[in-house]
Amino acid sequence: MSLLKGRNYYKPFTYPEFYNKWDKHEKSHWLPSEVPMHDDVNDWKNRLNDNQRDFLTNIFRFFTQGDVDVASAYYTQYLPFFKLPEVTMMMGGFAGREGVHIDAYSYLLETLGMPEATYKEFLMYEEMKDKQDYIKKFSDSRHILGKGEENLTTEDKEHIAAGIALFSGFTEGMQLFSTFAMLLIFPLNGFMKGMGQIVTWSIVDETQHTEGMIELFKVFVEENKTGDQPIRPSVLQETVYKIAKEMVGLEEAFIDLVFKKYKDEPINDDNDLETKDNKDFFGLTPQRLKAYIKYIADRRLNLMGYKSIFNLEPYPTNPLPELEIMINAPTHTNFFENRSTDYANVSTKGTWSEIWNKPQ
């Protein structure tokens, strides 16, 4: 068996597990137009203060672009190499859903009245541009394309595997979750509920994407540890660890940027990692958020079969336990309405307004 070999027929599947992931993912389709946003507009204009709007604006500047870059990775880094129908179906489904995310985040920005110039403003901030520049270093696979499986070198195979770790493990699986955490503190406290619904559904998607692609990573590495030009497990491990550390560092710089305006406030006391009563950010501190992304990065490493490298203290468990259920559960309790957000189309009947207002 080989993930890199194509097949001239649809069935039998070589890797039915990837078809199953596609099937589950496609039953969870959604569109941004299904999310009511009128309360968010009122919150933005009348309920949020200047600090909160400024905080969210800094996040929004890179929010859409982050998923544009992830979607591009599926088309340029993954699909050119993996030809089997069940694998391309899974990847194609994931890539298509990134398009939904891009449109949803854009829908949010435009509903709030933000100008189109917002989409390019991230280029003015070193901390945001550095995140994009880093992943672009891994985006050029022209030296591999067209070689054919039999001509791939050890370095080529390690490049493919490291790219999956970077894009799916630490971009989708860690950096996006950092953004989700910063955004979710608002709907968890009664603000921006439409934004919260978009983020909640995106979490479901990105969890499936991360888990599906990391499973592919493990199968690919296992298949290529022997034979001609084998992957060197110790070399790949060190590469993945290096990527994890560098991407966590980039995300920490972004977190510092988002909180920079408030650096003189007590929430940024480097000696205090615990929640403080901050009325603008509901107790979320840069320290807790940085601990959280390290916690998430370790979980992604564990899923790949590697040991944790951050080993957080004083947080041996999730530093943001209020988000635990939203990130790890397949069906989430909607904190904003206390209703299920399992949005599988096969189980949805009637209009969305009827669903939201249905008695429990």
Swiss-Prot record:
Active site: 105
Keywords: Deoxyribonucleotide synthesis, Iron, Metal-binding, Oxidoreductase
Note on cofactor: Binds 2 iron ions per subunit.
Binding positions for Fe cation 2 per the UniProt entry: 98, 172, 206, 209
Known cofactor(s): Fe cation
GO terms of biological process kind: deoxyribonucleotide biosynthetic process
Binding-site list for Fe cation 1: 67, 98, 101
A Pfam family per the record: Ribonuc_red_sm
Known EC number: 1.17.4.1
Iron as UniProt keyword: yes
Catalytic activity line of the entry: a 2'-deoxyribonucleoside 5'-diphosphate + [thioredoxin]-disulfide + H2O = a ribonucleoside 5'-diphosphate + [thioredoxin]-dithiol
GO molecular function, one term: ribonucleoside-diphosphate reductase activity, thioredoxin disulfide as acceptor
Family matches, as InterPro entries: Ferritin-like_SF, RNR-like, RNR_small, RNR_small_fam
Superkingdom in the source lineage: Viruses
Described purpose of this protein according to its UniProt entry: Ribonucleoside-diphosphate reductase holoenzyme provides the precursors necessary for viral DNA synthesis. Allows virus growth in non-dividing cells. Catalyzes the biosynthesis of deoxyribonucleotides from the corresponding ribonucleotides.
PANTHER family per UniProt: RIBONUCLEOSIDE-DIPHOSPHATE REDUCTASE SMALL CHAIN, RIBONUCLEOSIDE-DIPHOSPHATE REDUCTASE SUBUNIT M2
Quaternary structure and partners: Heterotetramer composed of a homodimer of the large subunit (R1) and a homodimer of the small subunit (R2). Larger multisubunit protein complex are also active, composed of (R1)n(R2)n.
Family under the similarity heading: Belongs to the ribonucleoside diphosphate reductase small chain family.
Name of the featured protein: Probable ribonucleoside-diphosphate reductase small subunit 376L
Organism: Invertebrate iridescent virus 6
